[in-house]
Each structure stands twice: as structure tokens, then as C-alpha cells.
């Protein structure tokens, strides 16, 4: 560790050295995994699957009378808290798309369900690649897990929203002190929900054991980046409305794509942090970082060995 910078003269505390080695390894790991390319791919799949996902979710909620009106509340909450700027235009477009799906045949409805499964499957594959998972889940187990997400997920979301609405209607909130606490809780609710979702994602999706503390650290970093990017992206859209000037009424489409891309980039950064924290043995000096990456790509290994041979000869 004392030779982290290639010199014994420059000595840093052990924790600082470990931190610098971790950051270098993390950057090399993210470059190696090309998370910017994968984020673009996931953004593309998400835009193809977002309407099917919402359609499946809302159709399941509509089967339960207790969840009446929960769908509209859920859409408004997602748009207002997780889509910065142009939220009204995106909301209106999504509502129009979802309304049109009611005219579809059974074959079209089956296609929507397959598209929703495709998104979940691609998320699973990309995150398992980050953790270098070589052993794939059985097809039956994977399908049952995806099915559970699509069926139980909407029910749990609807139950939480219904419970929140019930608590809001109680007279206990008439108290000024409790009302202040409730307002603060609502202000922090998007951050709490996003960080909790990241923790669950980093713990449950990889087909290997992930330490809870590592998942929490990665989730907190991702949640902070998400909140900062939300404010920064909203400020950029409002202060520099180039998309509105160029695309006019269609500006919501590229804006939504860029935002979804940023979201997936943040998700993958948090996953890389979580995975790298569990690979302490690979935190080495910068010149050894690439060779230390646990890789499941045989072609890349061959290219690396060929480069070493050429340099030695």
C-alpha cells in the first residue's frame, strides 16, 4: 500500500491509501464494464417497456376495489418526484398511451406483458454481469421471479399508497407538531423510497451473496446522485431550454430519454460501488488495476495477454 503512487517517499494514512486505491479500481472497473453503453441500452429498453409496465401495473391494481383511484395517485407521485421538468407533458403523453392500450386485442396485451418481462430480464442480466456472476438462474426460477415482480409488486405499491392516504385522512394530523413532522417526512419520502429501492435491487437481483453494508453504501451514493441529478437536470431544462426551441411540442421525448439514461447510469454506478466494495483484494496500484479486474470475458483476457507478450518482445 505504501507504494500506491510508485514512490516510498509519499506516505499516506492507511485509510486514505485504501480510499484512493478503491476509487482508482472503481473508475477502471466502470470503464471496463462500459456502463455508459449499458445505460443507453437499458434506457432504450425502458422507453419501449415503460407503457407496458405501467399498463400491467395499473390493470392489476384495477382488479382490487380497495385500490380505486390509486393508479392516478401513483402516476402523479412518480411524475412529480422522479421526473424533473416537463413532467406535465410526459404525464399527459403516458396517460394517452395507456388509454390507447385499452383498445388492444388479447395478442397485443400478451405483447405488452412480454415487453414488461423483457425490461426486468435485461436489468437482471446487466446487474449480474457487474457482479461477474457466471452461474445463471434456472429459466423456471427466473420466470417465476419476474412474474412475482409484475404481480405482487403492483399490489404492494397500491397497498402502501392506500395506507398513506388513510393515515393522511386521520385527525391526528390536525396537530401542528405532527403536521410539521409529516411535511418533513413527505419531503424526504422520495429519497427514502429511492434509497430503499436501490438497496433491494443490489441485494436481490445479483445471483450471489451481497453484504448488506455494501448494498447500503452503494444505494446511498446512488440515491444522492439521483437527487442531485434531478435538481441539476431540472435547472438545465428550465435555464437552457434548447430542446424546447429545437423540438417544440416533441421536446418531451428527447428530454425523457436523456433523463432515463441518467437514471440508469446512476443505478449502474451504485451497482459498481457495491460490487467493488466486495472485491477489496483487487484494490491495487493504478497500473495493476485493469489486470486485477475479475473478468468473465475470455476474448478480453486473450487481448490482454497478447498485449503483454508484444510489449515484452
Swiss-Prot record:
The chain crosses the membrane at residues 41-61, 104-124, 139-159, 185-205, 215-235, 249-269. The keyword Repeat does not apply. The keyword RNA-binding does not apply. Keywords: Cell inner membrane, Cell membrane, Membrane, Transmembrane, Transmembrane helix. It is a multi-pass membrane protein. PANTHER family: INNER MEMBRANE PROTEIN YHJD, UPF0761 MEMBRANE PROTEIN YIHY. This is UPF0761 membrane protein VV1_0885.
Amino acid at each position: 500500500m505504501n507504494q500506491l503512487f510508485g514512490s516510498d517517499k509519499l506516505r499516506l494514512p492507511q485509510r486514505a491509501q485504501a480510499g484512493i486505491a478503491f476509487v482508482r479500481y472503481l473508475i477502471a472497473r466502470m470503464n471496463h464494464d462500459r456502463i455508459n453503453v449499458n445505460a443507453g441500452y437499458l434506457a432504450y429498453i425502458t422507453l419501449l417497456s415503460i407503457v407496458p409496465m405501467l399498463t400491467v401495473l395499473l390493470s392489476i391494481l384495477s382488479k382490487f376495489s380497495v385500490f380505486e383511484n390509486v393508479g392516478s395517485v401513483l402516476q402523479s407521485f412518480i411524475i412529480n418526484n422522479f421526473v424533473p421538468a416537463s413532467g406535465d407533458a410526459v404525464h399527459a403523453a403516458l396517460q394517452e398511451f395507456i388509454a390507447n392500450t385499452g383498445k388492444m386485442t388479447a395478442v397485443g396485451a400478451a405483447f405488452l406483458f412480454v415487453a414488461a418481462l423483457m425490461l426486468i430480464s435485461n436489468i437482471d442480466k446487466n446487474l449480474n454481469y457487474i457482479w461477474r456472476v457466471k452461474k445463471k438462474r434456472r429459466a423456471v426460477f427466473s420466470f417465476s421471479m419476474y412474474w412475482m415482480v409484475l404481480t405482487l409488486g403492483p399490489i404492494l405499491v397500491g397497498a402502501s399508497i392506500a395506507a398513506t392516504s388513510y393515515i393522511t385522512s386521520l385527525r391526528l394530523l390536525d396537530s401542528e407538531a405532527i403536521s410539521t413532522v409529516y411535511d418533513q417526512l413527505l419531503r424526504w419520502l422520495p429519497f427514502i423510497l429511492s434509497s430503499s429501492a436501490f438497496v433491494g435491487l443490489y441485494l436481490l437481483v445479483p445471483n450471489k451473496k451481497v453484504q448488506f453494508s455494501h448494498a447500503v453504501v452503494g444505494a446511498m451514493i446512488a440515491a444522492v446522485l439521483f437527487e442531485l441529478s434531478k435538481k441539476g437536470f431540472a435547472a438545465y431544462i428550465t435555464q437552457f431550454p434548447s430542446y424546447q426551441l429545437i423540438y417544440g411540442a416533441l421536446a418531451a421525448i428527447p428530454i425523457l430519454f436523456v433523463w432515463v439514461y441518467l437514471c440508469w447510469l446512476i443505478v449502474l454506478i451504485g451497482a459498481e460501488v457495491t460490487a467493488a466494495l466486495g472485491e477489496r483484494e483487487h484494490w491495487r496500484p493504478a497500473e495493476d488495476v485493469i489486470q486485477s479486474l475479475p473478468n468473465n470475458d475470455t476474448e478480453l483476457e486473450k487481448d490482454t495477454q497478447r498485449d503483454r507478450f508484444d510489449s515484452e518482445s
